[in-house]
Design a protein with these regions (language model features):
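Non-catalytic cap/lid and distal C-terminal segments of serine-dependent acyl enzymes
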Residues: 1-253
């Protein structure tokens, strides 16, 4: 399997950023690591083994983004506005700088077609879902596993314009029925899953809230509630019960 590590300068973040690429050609998949994770975690958690049938056959290329969660969502105790402004800068790094990089590499491989799939576990799932729902014009698939989709766990009762714009439960709930994104959501595919085992309680509750919003608004997202034997650590590590379910989820997209 071809693996590349690429470093480039981000004007949005005023620093060098790195990302890793697995494969060449096919559908671009943008992976986000767990809370405080790094761009090399996809390989470190042995996820290429699960994705290898698609990567090796040229059906997809996985791009692994870096995070700044420890300066944003996970920087508990720091000023809330500072935290969410940092996240918003990272968001613009993804959509304004990394997405064009992905397009450039896909064009070099002769396989660029509009639309990128987002994928992540835990906090990576939150990023995957948020980017998909905020920019369905850029991202046409989403696979989110065991994530939080509102602000309560990280910001409590604090909510400003940027927190609102990064919580799908909030902004989807208030999206007008005639918003052009509605047609995009309903012509694309998104899969959000959560376990019902140990350490999934808060994540399960947040997933149900998003499920309720999507049902009420007529947004076609598939929600799956995996078994009571599926705990958070298994999903994040992608071993044990999580591994076959992950492969099954990929096939649905």
């Amino acid at each position: 399997m071809e693996v590349r590590t690429i470093k480039h300068y981000s004007n949005c973040l005023n620093r060098d950023m790195e990302y890793q690429v697995f494969g060449s050609g096919g559908k671009p998949v943008l992976f986000f690591p767990c809370q405080g994770g790094r761009f090399f975690d996809f390989g470190g958690n042995n996820m290429p083994a699960t994705w290898s049938p698609w990567i090796e056959s040229g059906l997809c290329t996985v791009y692994c983004a870096d995070s700044i969660d420890n300066e944003a969502w996970a920087a508990l105790g720091c000023d809330n506005r500072w935290r969410i402004e940092n996240h918003e800068r990272w968001y613009h790094y993804i959509v304004d700088e990394l997405v064009p990089e992905i397009r450039r590499l896909q064009e070099q491989a002769g396989s660029w077609q509009k639309g990128i799939m987002t994928f992540g576990c835990s906090m990576g799932a939150m990023h995957a879902a948020n980017l998909y729902y905020r920019r369905p014009d850029l991202f046409d698939r989403c696979f989110a596993i065991s994530g939080l989709y509102d602000n309560k766990e990280f910001f409590g009762d604090y909510c400003d314009d940027l927190v609102y714009n990064n919580c799908p439960v909030f902004y989807l709930n208030n999206m007008p029925a005639d918003h052009p994104y509605m047609n995009l959501y309903n012509s694309q595919k998104s899969l959000i899953v959560v376990g019902q085992g140990a350490w999934e309680d808060v994540l399960l509750e947040s997933t149900r809230r998003l499920d309720e919003v999507c049902c009420r608004k007529g947004i076609h997202t598939r929600f799956e509630y995996w078994g009571y034997d599926v705990n958070h650590d298994a999903l994040v590590a992608q071993n044990g019960t999580g591994l076959p379910s992950l492969a099954a989820g990929i096939r649905k997209l």
